[in-house]
Amino acid sequence: MAVTTRLTWLHEKILQNHFGGKRLSLLYKGSVHGFRNGVLLDRCCNQGPTLTVIYSEDHIIGAYAEESYQEGKYASIILFALQDTKISEWKLGLCTPETLFCCDVTKYNSPTNFQIDGRNRKVIMDLKTMENLGLAQNCTISIQDYEVFRCEDSLDERKIKGVIELRKSLLSALRTYEPYGSLVQQIRILLLGPIGAGKSSFFNSVRSVFQGHVTHQALVGTNTTGISEKYRTYSIRDGKDGKYLPFILCDSLGLSEKEGGLCRDDIFYILNGNIRDRYQFNPMESIKLNHHDYIDSPSLKDRIHCVAFVFDASSIQYFSSQMIVKIKRIRRELVNAGVVHVALLTHVDSMDLITKGDLIEIERCEPVRSKLEEVQRKLGFALSDISVVSNYSSEWELDPVKDVLILSALRRMLWAADDFLEDLPFEQIGNLREEIINCAQGKK
């Protein structure tokens, strides 16, 4: 049976971030391996930097060793106390592991201001140490349990290699993707969501990955009315002079609960393929049928094959009841129209305590999982239909971890679009295939 830590996710993240963003790997647990400090040192010496966490009835305290414990050798020790979400620290200074853990106080000089006595299940501190750590003035703390962790890099060489391989695999899959039944050459994905959610940034991020450097073709910003005021359909080249990829990302004016956002009627003109690229939206009224950017008889290739609702992960909790009602109403109308849709959570890297290491297994991350459940609860999306990304915003260089999230989300959208194409009425598919065959024969 695997040995697990007593730390909550939140407390573990606070400690990780406080001590250099390291990943904590459990080496020793008193309640499992025994409260014998000699055994502790046998397991924990020569392991690199370590973090000892002590649990009492009222406190979580401990010691961080910046260097590896070695028998008889001094290491720099930092003491800490964790209370709720606040952490305080005090530098104990140089100390041998034997004296810190009360293993042989006769052979080495014993510090009188802090000792961990596993055999008697207590921590001994002087008043000054208690005061520096912000603890109540009680010189002895009973130990319920204690754990020692090895502090490792959150992204070791093995993990980085795995991320790079996954990125390579995703790029290959997206480059060679073919829409279901060859009914269209390019899938059209509409990015829809509140103003400032990150729709244009997601397009820029996708383009950046395929261009091999960070790009900003679509303007982004934080205006309350949004930056995107035109309908844009973006084809993306594979590299600077490469062929166009088999998908088009469509950007639009953001949704607003008040005046200034995208008209609901315009959404369905977009879905049906009636609106041309670069149409200037009018927030007060939808497109007129006699407008020069209105397409009278759009074909399947002009239609939207998947809608991706884009939400800022840090803003979901602040959605007004009007915004929630608007999104739910649009979703119902999409379902009635047979249009598949997914959700995209952006800005997850700006959430509290999220580290780069968390982005590798982002959906296992507790705060992100909580956000996914919030989207499910408030807006009705299935958890399996929600992707998580970290867009490029201020970075100068590409990051393979971010790339994997972006490419995975895009692949999920293409899978959803295939579902839409496969679900088209049989008669419509038959007519389309006949048109495709006739067109191909006419080119010969």
Curated annotation (Swiss-Prot):
Q: Which GO terms describe its biological process?
A: cellular response to virus; immune response; response to bacterium; response to virus
Give the record's GO CC terms.
Answer: cytosol
Question: InterPro entries of this UniProt entry?
Answer: P-loop_NTPase (IPR027417), TLDc_dom (IPR006571)
Taxonomy, superkingdom? Eukaryota
Please indicate if the UniProt record lists Cytoplasm as a keyword. yes
Chief localization: cytoplasm
Every copy of the TLDc domain together lies at: 1-152
Q: What induces it?
A: By alpha and beta interferons, but not by gamma interferons.
Q: Does the keyword Aminoacyl-tRNA synthetase apply?
A: no
Where is this protein found? Cytoplasm
Keyword set, alphabetical order: Cytoplasm
Residues folding into a coiled coil are: none
Q: Which residues form the signal peptide?
A: none
UniProt xrefs under Gene3D superfamilies: P-loop containing nucleotide triphosphate hydrolases (3.40.50.300)
PANTHER family from the xrefs? INTERFERON-INDUCED PROTEIN 44 (PTHR14241:SF3)
State its role: This protein aggregates to form microtubular structures.
Q: Per the similarity annotation, which family is this?
A: Belongs to the IFI44 family.
What's the protein called, per UniProt? Interferon-induced protein 44
**What gene name is listed for this protein?**
IFI44
